[in-house]
Amino acid sequence: MASTDFSKIETLKQLNASLADKSYIEGTAVSQADVTVFKAFQSAYPEFSRWFNHIASKADEFDSFPAASAAAAEEEEDDDVDLFGSDDEEADAEAEKLKAERIAAYNAKKAAKPAKPAAKSIVTLDVKPWDDETNLEEMVANVKAIEMEGLTWGAHQFIPIGFGIKKLQINCVVEDDKVSLDDLQQSIEEDEDHVQSTDIAAMQKL
């Protein structure tokens, strides 16, 4: 026999075919060719060879051995199913663990970043009274009494606009995402005893 590489299935097939009509590898008696093939097969499949030789030694007792238990076979089959199920569960658990770790890492990275400062603007408002008899001090007090989250009142002044009438010009700083200027103007104009109208005179991002 040319090849003794029994790791290849083709070699096993060739050996089986060559022994179809003879009892030895070469000739009509045991020779070193048989020994070489035997050792090569045993080297390639040591556990199978050990099992085969062990079972072959008990050939005379084959009929006395008990049949395989159906319950045991079924239990073994169930164990196999459970085993595969366990593998799936372990894989799912591992995937969930990895997902949780990634989310935690993302949140930690996000938390580590410094918070962006709130966008703010400085706004100058013109508040016009009804006439020259309007009490401007009361009007400015009412304006500054308005409180909103993100609103900070600043300096003010009274500017003449004609016929003895003065308007209130007042500065404030607002957080853009918290303070609506429309709402702020509406709140000021609710002081109907003093305020005729309001306008945004200037606005600049900080």
Curated annotation (Swiss-Prot):
Cross-link (Glycyl lysine isopeptide (Lys-Gly) (interchain with G-Cter in ubiquitin)): 13
Gene3D superfamilies: 1.20.1050.130, 3.30.70.60
Effect of residue 205 to A: Loss of catalytic activity, but still binds to eEF1A
Pfam family, one: EF1_GNE
InterPro entries in the record: Arc1-like_N, eEF-1beta-like_sf, EF-1_beta_acid_region_euk, EF1B_bsu/dsu, EF1B_bsu/dsu_GNE, Glutathione-S-Trfase_C_sf, Transl_elong_EF1B/ribsomal_bS6, Transl_elong_EF1B_B/D_CS
MF-aspect GO terms: guanyl-nucleotide exchange factor activity; translation elongation factor activity
Pathway noted in the entry: Protein biosynthesis; polypeptide chain elongation
Modified residues (Phosphoserine): 31, 86
Modified residues (N-acetylalanine): 2
Effect after changing residue 121 to I/L/N: Reduces translation efficiency and enhances translation fidelity
Keywords on record: Acetylation, Elongation factor, Isopeptide bond, Phosphoprotein, Protein biosynthesis, Ubl conjugation
Biological process terms in GO annotation: maintenance of translational fidelity; negative regulation of actin filament bundle assembly; regulation of translational termination; translational elongation
PTM per Swiss-Prot/TrEMBL: S-thiolated in response to oxidative stress, probably inhibiting the protein and causing a reduction in protein synthesis.
Annotated GO CC locations: cytosol; eukaryotic translation elongation factor 1 complex; ribosome
Subunit structure: The eukaryotic elongation factor 1 complex (eEF1) is probably a heterohexamer. Two trimeric complexes, each composed of eEF1A (TEF1 or TEF2), eEF1Balpha (EFB1) and eEF1Bgamma (CAM1 or TEF4), are probably dimerized via the eF1Bgamma subunits. eEF1Balpha interacts directly with eEF1A. eEF1Balpha and eEF1Bgamma form the eEF1B subcomplex with the GEF activity.
Function: Catalytic subunit of the guanine nucleotide exchange factor (GEF) (eEF1B subcomplex) of the eukaryotic elongation factor 1 complex (eEF1). Stimulates the exchange of GDP for GTP on elongation factor 1A (eEF1A), probably by displacing GDP from the nucleotide binding pocket in eEF1A. The 30-fold higher concentration of GTP compared to GDP in cells favors the formation of eEF1A-GTP, which rapidly forms a ternary complex with aminoacyl-tRNA that in turn displaces eEF1B from the complex.
Family named by the database record: Belongs to the EF-1-beta/EF-1-delta family.
Domain notes: The C-terminus (pos. 119-205) exhibits guanine nucleotide exchange activity.
Name listed for the protein in its UniProt record: Elongation factor 1-beta
Species whose genome carries this gene: Saccharomyces cerevisiae (strain ATCC 204508 / S288c)
Gene name of this polypeptide: EFB1
